[in-house]
Amino acid sequence: MSALTPHVGVRTLHDGTDAEPLLIADMSTIGGVFVAADADAAKFPLNVPVSFTTDDAAMVAAAGVAAGNTLAQTIEAISSEGVIARMVAVRVAAGSDATATLANVVGSSGAKTGAWALLEAGSETGDDPDILIAPGFTHNRVSNAANPVATAFDAICERLPTAIAVCDGPGTTNAAASEWAADFADTVNICLIDPPVR
């Protein structure tokens, strides 16, 4: 009887026979920025996003094993959980000191280096990262200001619609964690983990 009632406007009837496309979004690709001095430079060039899975033996071997290699440590941590993950890794050079290394991890938005290279992952590898990490570089506030890596991740997440950054907190006191979290109180792109993941 609804067809007999007065109607003004457009009426659309769906007969249910059309096939609807099933869209599946992969929301589990880990995008990370790592220092791995002993990694194979041919397979992990500096400031270039590289996509691989953690069960790819050749890529895992190419990641290196030296102390301080955050890429190898991350792969090991993922594998120890008994899961296989797709990763987009950006390798950066260690600087002459901690401040220089942190600057390399942050990188340049214009030159797309460091964390900003993750924005090129979709076009270069076909995999857009969804979970952004930089193990060992997000836990501290620098000069009593917001962590620069987390700040870069916040801006990157605005341009990668499904991305979220998982950042280690200071791991010291509740007050320090609260202060860190307050720097990002106005964003939903940053997930603070405190105490940090080990």
Where are these predicted regions, by residue range?
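Surface-exposed assembly/interface segments
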Residues: M1-R198
